[in-house]
Amino acid sequence: MSGEPTFHELGARTNFSFLEGAAPAEEMIVFAKKAGLSGLGVADRNSVAGVVRAHAKAKVEDYPFQPGARLVFADATPDILAYPKNRRGWGHLCRLLSVGNLRAKKGDCTLYLADLLEWQEDLLLIVMPGEGRPQPEILEALLEKLKASAGNRLYLGLAPRYDSFDRHDFAVLATVARSLDVRLLATNDALYHDPHYRPLADVVTAIREHVPIASAGFLLQKNAERHLKGPKEMVRLFRDYPEAIVNANKFFKRLSFSLDELSHQYPDENAEGETPAESLRRLVAEGALERYPSGVPEKVTRQIEYELELIHDKKYEPYFLTVHKLVKFARSVNILCQGRGSAANSSVCFCLGITDVDPQKFTLLFDRFLSRDRDEPPDIDVDFEHERREEVIQYIYRTYGKEHAGLTAAVISYRSRSAGREVAKAFGLSEDVQSALVSSVWGWGTSPFTEEQAKGAGLDMADPLTRRVLAYASLLMNFPRHLSQHVGGFVITRDRLDEVVPIMNTAMPDRYMIEWDKDDLDQLKILKVDVLALGMLTCLARAFRFLEVHYGKPKTLAELYEDQQAAVYDMICRADTVGVFQIESRAQMSMLPRLRPREMYDLVIEVAIVRPGPIQGNMVHPYLKRREAQRKGEPVDYPSPELKAVLERTLGVPLFQEQAMQIAITAAGFSPSEADRLRRAMATFKRTGTIHTFERKMIDGMVRNGYEREFAERCFNQIKGFGEYGFPESHAASFASLVYASSWFKAYYPDIFCAALLNSQPMGFYAPAQLVRDAREHGVRILPVDVNHSDWDALLEGEAMFRKEAIDPRHGEMRDVIRSGKAVRLGFRLVKGLRQPDMEALVARRGEGYRSVHDLWLRSGLTRAVLERLADADAFRSIGLDRRRALWAVKALNEQSAVERLPLFDGAGSTDLQVEPAVALPDMAAGEHVIHDYRYLTLSLKAHPVSFMRGDFARMGILSSRDLARTPAGRRVTVAGLVLVRQRPGSANGVIFMTIEDETGVANIIVWEKTFQKYRPQVMGSRLVKVRGRLQSESGVIHVVAEYMEDMTPMLGLLRNEARRFGANDRADEALRPTADARDKKALRQLRPAPPAQEGLETSEAGSAVAEVMPKGRNFH
């Protein structure tokens, strides 16, 4: 074997050379090893985003790997491969890439040769000659300049192009190299690993160049040779230049850097004169006295000491101090925030005020958060108000600077929809076929395309082109498209961050991110803190302000937590939870009447139980069964007193990851660290299968401790059923307090709750239309957007505006509970196309109110386009104009007559200058109003679209959603409504839960997998759908189990047809036989008698136009 050739490939690109490389980094490593390459260097285009993945895979494979980057310049300098010789060289490479990133827009890197000359120390460089014929003069000048700085760290690459010119080109390059004493280096400049991936390389080229493959011509690779080649083949190819092979091997051996050398130090946050450990201990002691004003329990003191010792051993004090500093800042400026996730297992975090869940109350497990034997950094997630989180982010940048703080990247990858569309486009399929193909895909998953989806899109599976499109779309899935900023993961360092990883601009101003995602950071053991945004915290912060300002009742989250009210739980048990945090989905609403929460811990269970883990572990029904038995006074049997202590709070059924760990510790003799490894194996067993390594140890351990083998096996299988979906109790406990707080506001102050929710959009499960409908059903009066009354946000106004008799009978129990007294005035934020600064100017200059459109135009300084949008939104009712007349008045404004806005005319009353058009405009029909409401506001206070079809529906035997409550279970029924929500939980075996809405309320639809496959276009594409099926009722929750579905979207045309029957038209500047103002010549030209309604007008034609403004329905997993 000693005679076998060796070769190290240094020119490999991965799919992190976005739309250039055509193979994942991990597959490149595996293939390189299999091909017999002695080592692999990865050098992606101006990036090191993919090197951690290659590094991690190389460690698993025990394979030599080196990270580098392919430097692509903006000044016509040929590409140069740069590899760090050592840790200092890595820092220089990161600084170099950061320079290019920060001078360019997000996603670009603009480098010049001068940048490389500044940062070339400790970098080994390979000049690549490029795709065309070598240009000796240019290469000589470049090499001379580089050699003066880099010396013997400089090489000239030889890369065959397999185009019959290689012999000539190599000779030219060799002559240049010899003349300058620069060494040649062999590489195949690989774009992918396997030659079979060449067609995929063509696909990504076509996507990158925005041309179909058939038209790409010379943009495509000439052959399939740009793959990883083994040593024998490379030696054969470079037989005339054996020194190039030798130099590649020597080059690789000169590289001593490993990504494992990267160390991360959090900034020193300790007070002057204290070590970080002393500062943390002092802050925890002070916080403990605040958390336990009656004295810190001995058990808590012991736990705090245990945690502090472990934190000290791991040297994590600066990390905790940094997170504490961020939370302290947020609270100092009244930003609502709360830690969650595994950090809620920590008493230290609780005492520091980072989390609000007392681990002692919930019997949480610290080792779930931080373990002595687990060489992994802790992960603290903190939620902030989503509209004010930017203040925290900018505080971080102000405090530490972009050289020391950056957001984590998120790798945006191709999913089924994007891959399907892009590949179909690359193969030249029409836009219609592309849209049909992607519309057959559920959500944003990465499941391969099926034959049914292709047929549904009108594709012929017998056609080889169709099969290629589906095959390459499936291959493209999970390929990275680009880097985006993580939702809030921050890396903060004491040393320069841009010497650890390149930093780059984001699409948002004054934000910077790094090139690695959270998995990369975990792999390298680099700590991050998650500064996350939570819409419900924004909603609650606004609700607390409303409560104090309008009702004189200041409250806090902590006070609500202690104010446990039976009326709130009664409402929850009735599943009256639209808008409530975490329990507003159909699946949660179905569970609430069965679980019937009566205390805070019940909400902890409710949050966690409707999750894939407990469902797949077959834990839901046993838990509900035992809960019902408990209500009847029946005792719960436990296998042992020890396990009773672990499982008593969940009635003997393990629902949480922490319980799985505690069972392993208590019943099987696991150490806390072993139990944590079990938890991690549970989280990844579908991908790695490692949970089985714990099976014998756990079962045998339980048997040794006196448990029956059958019980031990059942217990392990139940834990295994958690899979990767097990829900941590600490996470559920953190969320439960927000569930109760949002429920409290909904129960007692639905006016506040509605306004706060509207002002916190986008968030939650339901659109504003459904939030408004629900508030009205609870007796809240909703007032329309108006130029004289609205603000940007929704407001509360009026006194004694609440009417108990307006409460829908379905919510009659709330009549003596609700304390509301205000009406909700909708805000300008709901109007599509309006800008907040414009509306703030309108409000600021409103004074006593605007008397006319002309008055508003003069005083507000807004453009006519903004006024048109206000008229579109029907916002001029307070001055006596509906949207048609308001639009006409806006059209009559002469934008050129800006002289009327000059100070000279300030003394004149607005009516002196106003000349309203004298025109007889017909009233706009109700259906047309509703269309415009949905077009510009996404909701209507005037009528529900389905109300215009009720007569037709009644003749078709279609029931209203209200009728379902009066229909016996088991009967076959037909319902129809607008599609609001489609939910397809990953644990539901393909079942889809749909929510549809008519003018009387919502109906819940269950679509089994078989039915979904039969009616996929109707489920996925309908905006108005008819469903026939059997009525199912359980614990007060009503569903229709779909058997037949029909797309009724064309019937939405009835709204427009209804308007046309009365001679109404689409635009307000069109009228029947109008008298126009002679000032407006353009308006005169536009005025024409409306054509008579066509006989036999197709409903589908009008329906397709109206459907565009109706909600598409939201898809959730």
UniProtKB/Swiss-Prot annotation:
Principal localisation: cytoplasm
Database matches in CDD domains: DnaE_OBF, PHP_PolIIIA_DnaE2
Compartments it resides in: Cytoplasm
UniProt EC number: 2.7.7.7
InterPro entries per UniProt: DNA_pol3_alpha_NTPase_dom (IPR011708), DNA_pol3_finger (IPR040982), DnaE2 (IPR023073), DnaE2/DnaE/PolC (IPR004805), DNAPol_HHH (IPR029460), NA-bd_OB_tRNA (IPR004365), PHP_dom (IPR004013), Pol/His_phosphatase_N (IPR003141)
Keywords carried by this UniProt record: Cytoplasm, DNA damage, DNA repair, DNA replication, DNA-directed DNA polymerase, Nucleotidyltransferase, Transferase
Entry GO CC: cytoplasm
Catalysed reactions listed for this entry: DNA(n) + a 2'-deoxyribonucleoside 5'-triphosphate = DNA(n+1) + diphosphate
SMART domains in the cross-refs: POLIIIAc (SM00481)
Pfam families: DNA_pol3_alpha (PF07733), DNA_pol3_finger (PF17657), HHH_6 (PF14579), PHP (PF02811), tRNA_anti-codon (PF01336)
Gene Ontology annotations of biological process type: DNA repair; DNA replication
Enzyme class, broadest EC rank: transferase
Disordered, as annotated region: 1086-1117
GO molecular function: 3'-5' exonuclease activity; DNA-directed DNA polymerase activity; nucleic acid binding
Family statement: Belongs to the DNA polymerase type-C family. DnaE2 subfamily.
HAMAP family documented for this protein: DNApol_error_prone
Function: DNA polymerase involved in damage-induced mutagenesis and translesion synthesis (TLS). It is not the major replicative DNA polymerase.
Name of the protein described by the UniProt record: Error-prone DNA polymerase
